[in-house]
Amino acid sequence: MLVHAHPDDESTGTGATMARYANEGATVSLVTCTSGELGEVVADDLAHLRGNPDALGEHRRGEIAEALRELGDIRHHWLGGPGRFRDSGMAGEDTNDAAECFAKADRDDVTRAMVEILRAERPHVVVTYDDTGGYGHPDHIAANHALMYALGPAADPAYLPELGEPWDVPKVYWMTLPRSFVKDVQAAGIEGFEPFTVPDEDITAVLDGRDHHAKKLAALRTYRSQVSLDDGDFFATLVQDPRFAIEHYVLVRGERGPGSGPHNWENDLFAGLD
Ligand SMILES: CC(=O)N[C@H]1[C@@H](O[C@@H]2[C@H](O)[C@H](O)[C@@H](O)[C@H](O)[C@H]2O)O[C@H](CO)[C@@H](O)[C@@H]1O
Ligand SMILES: [Zn+2]
């Protein structure tokens, strides 16, 4: 199970991982916390969505449905239901304080909604952002908190038993990028990734999803409101590189399974589970 903040985050950060496990017949579920109502609309033929959060949210809900079909058989949940928690906007924007935004949502409401999904899906592995949200977006940080604060209650038989049988998630990973990745892409002229990386020795798992790079690209292409892969900017250049389908994780809960290479990286998130 993967927990992401906005439509398109799942494909950008973990699309190849999702495609690999869906291809292998594993049960892959996704929790998206907001519909991304405040995103910048990059496609001029979608200009009518600019300044119309409800319309953009509805449009992005359609985009993610199409994107997930490109990745494989993915079970999709909106945290609290579609539109329940709304996009908080980029860090520092006034919208970060809007009553209905995800970053300001009531902790009990968020935990209840996440526990309901955790107990329904009973995932052996859960993936989300690190506690910086990857790049500091309030909704990404809130998504990390939504999962991490729900792990205890989900496993507690005394917590809202009406939400289902308790479930203790065996393994949790946070997504990240190794510092070596930056050196690789800098050689290709792609700058700006350094702040979002960790030392290679801090990585615990690497999923080489290059066999699924095409699916990751196809999923990203469905997000026309947010992503243009043909404008030659650094992101468009990055995603075309097959190395973009190599996805890296740090284990933050559970036992590390067998690995390989100089840092003994796991190459399977289910490593060590029976
Ligand atoms: C990848 C991601 O998390 N995107 C978020 C982010 O989008 C950025 C935002 O629209 C900003 O104004 C742009 O300049 C930047 O290029 C975008 O990546 O924040 C949005 C608002 O919270 C969110 O909807 C989008 O999914
Ligand atoms: Zn996001």
From Swiss-Prot:
GO molecular function, one term: zinc ion binding
Catalytic activities: 1D-myo-inositol 2-acetamido-2-deoxy-alpha-D-glucopyranoside + H2O = 1D-myo-inositol 2-amino-2-deoxy-alpha-D-glucopyranoside + acetate
Enzyme Commission number(s): 3.5.1.103
Source organism, top-level taxon: Bacteria
UniProt cross-references to NCBIfam families, sorted A to Z: mycothiol_MshB (TIGR03445)
Task performed by this protein: Catalyzes the deacetylation of 1D-myo-inositol 2-acetamido-2-deoxy-alpha-D-glucopyranoside (GlcNAc-Ins) in the mycothiol biosynthesis pathway.
Name of the protein: 1D-myo-inositol 2-acetamido-2-deoxy-alpha-D-glucopyranoside deacetylase 2
Organism of derivation: Saccharopolyspora erythraea (strain ATCC 11635 / DSM 40517 / JCM 4748 / NBRC 13426 / NCIMB 8594 / NRRL 2338)
Taxonomic lineage from the root: Bacteria, Bacillati, Actinomycetota, Actinomycetes, Pseudonocardiales
